[in-house]
Amino acid sequence: HEEAELD
């Protein structure tokens, strides 16, 4: 998976 930022 792609790296993603979580808020």
Curated annotation (Swiss-Prot):
Highest taxon in the source lineage: Eukaryota
Remarks, miscellaneous: On the 2D-gel the determined pI of this unknown protein is: 5.1, its MW is: 36 kDa.
Record-given protein name: Unknown protein from 2D-PAGE of fibroblasts
Organism: Mus musculus
